[in-house]
Amino acid sequence: VYACYADWGIKLKKAWQQYRRLVVVSAFGGVCALVLAGWLMFVLKPDSACGRLFMWKIACRAVAEQPLLGYGMGGFAAAYGNAQEAYFATGDYELWEERVAGSPEYAFNEYLQTAVELGGPLTLCLLAVVLFCLYIGIKNKRFGICGAVFSLMIFSFSSYPLQLPVFVVTAVCLLLACILRNYRWEWMGLVILAGGIGATRLKNDLCMEQACRNWMNARIFYNAAAYGSVEKEYRLLYPLLKKRAAFLFEYGHILHKQQKPEESIRILMEAMKYSSDPMILNIIGKNHQQTGDYLAAERWLIRSTYRLPGRIYPLSLIHI
């Protein structure tokens, strides 16, 4: 964006005409510096880098399984868990992949996450809208706003900013700012829109914050294994926190410890919609053990070993 603002294109043409050899050497040196910087960053934390690449590989496999419609909003974790489970079940993988595999909630790449949840066509449409807004913004010489959008796009390539409401509101406002004309009423409308969305989110977040506070208080008893005392608290919090995987897992685990396998399985099946954690499969397997259905228990525990082969806990349960 700054290059457009500073007319770097014209300056580079002049430099190419006058100092071709210097331009070639400088370009080669810049490429070498970027490659060296990338290699140094990889060497600094190789497992982290390999884990990120493996995560993207599994996310691509999830997209390939359902490329058109995706798995729905919030469906990334479940889709990722199933795709990783299917990948390791084939047995055709490298040892380093087993070492770096995990149970992520996000893809650490907003483009892949959107493709998994919404499908490829809608992802391309959204990207086209963003590029169109950038084109209009650069044409209107709003380089600062376009630079902010570019920064968010680069950030989105290796993280998950759009999973946080504040970044979603920021992105929408920046894109609208790219295409708005210089009429005061349009900018006032943008301010009112941003304020309205923020106020709505704040109201919802305040209710959720209080529920989470109550959950944290109840979790003290959960961590102390006082399952009988805390079951009622979790039941009361369930309507507000029924889309939080960690809460659902704890609630299902409490029901398992209270010898209520059917209820526990129902809650844990809901947790699987929002999480790829193999511990959910382990507890479901143990619930089937409680009911005497050992074949079903074995199936769930074997699925857990495929989801994260590096874990030995489900193997120990199978041999009990």
How should these model regions be labeled?
Residues 1-6, 145-190:
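Transmembrane alpha-helices of multi-pass inner-membrane enzymes
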Residues 21-40, 184-205:
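Internal/C-terminal transmembrane anchor helices
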Residues 38-54, 195-224:
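Hydrophobic alpha-helical transmembrane segments in integral membrane proteins
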Residues 73-116:
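Interfacial juxtamembrane loops and adjacent helix segments
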Residues 118-146, 301:
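Hydrophobic transmembrane alpha-helices and their immediate junctions
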Residues 318-320:
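Conserved small/polar residues in nucleotide/adenosyl-binding loops
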